Amino acid sequence: MMESGEALLKKLDGRLSGLRGRLTPDTGMDKITWFRAGGPAQVLFQPSDEEDLSAFLKAVPEEIPLLVVGIGSNLLVRDGGVPGFVVRLSAKGFGEVEQVCDTQLRAGAAAPDKRVAAAALEAGLADFHFYHGIPGGIGGALRMNAGANGVETRERVVEVRALDRKGEVHVLSNADMGYAYRHSSASPDLIFTSVLFEGVPGERDDIRRAMDEVQHHRETVQPVREKTGGSTFKNPEGTSAWKEIDKAGCRGLRVGGAQMSEMHCNFMINTGNATGHDLETLGETVRARVFENSGIRLHWEIKRLGLFREGEQIEEFLGKII
């Protein structure tokens, strides 16, 4: 069991006094994540801007755990909470999107993906329409190479601005990001703060039509009005996660208040009172049943984090990787 956030702040008394952002002890992560489940952050920090974040990183000893989150769309937080600091990049300090030249946009890491799609439409830049259908923020899109409709984040990235654990600035090229399918090999210790995108000129009517198609498709096949974290598992090579989940009889499967959506069975939803334990147990049950049915091991796309409640544990399904 972790100590209180107040106790942690007391240990750092004076070191954080110059910060302009907001420090909040013992804040429920269920207020932040789209699943609306999970235990508290020991201390939540919302920096005002990159300079404030840098000052915070320089002040906090490296042995204290630190987790950075964006808008909380693909996070499953365990019920025992998250020790140390959870840093949430705010829309005010990190959510702007601006056109910097004819073919380039700069976006803060907390900008919703949809905002980037809208800015690209206004600028007449094509091939950002896929962001219109991704329920997340740009920081997460950079970290996991988010994509849809045959387009991926890596195709648009010029450079990414980031801070390391010591608060020092780094600028990473597209190659530095080490992109692969739903993955970046950039150091997990780097905190992305903004990105420079490159687009190609397009007709606004065509871009708007593509965005409308993305939105229509999403509303037709995904549970967009439910409490969900988006796609639960990555697509295995040569097939789709939802197909394997469906073939294993897991469409609509429930554990407590957690359910695999009837509409799209690779989406896990909180039907009202799910705990983090319910959600993770459901996910591991699905992985086991899919492996038993098809020999395919599904890999989580949703990020799981935090501590189990005292006395709780989930044995991760360890199927053979093929």
UniProtKB/Swiss-Prot annotation:
Domain of life the protein comes from: Bacteria
Record keywords, A-Z: Cell cycle, Cell division, Cell shape, Cell wall biogenesis/degradation, Cytoplasm, FAD, Flavoprotein, NADP, Oxidoreductase, Peptidoglycan synthesis
Protein name according to UniProt: UDP-N-acetylenolpyruvoylglucosamine reductase
Stated family: Belongs to the MurB family.
Keyword Signal set for record: no
Subcellular location: Cytoplasm
Cellular component terms per the entry's GO annotation: cytosol
Pathway: Cell wall biogenesis; peptidoglycan biosynthesis
Organism (species): Brucella canis (strain ATCC 23365 / NCTC 10854 / RM-666)
Active-site residues annotated for this sequence: R182, S231, E301
Cofactor requirements of the protein: FAD
TM spans (from-to): none
Record-linked PROSITE patterns: FAD_PCMH
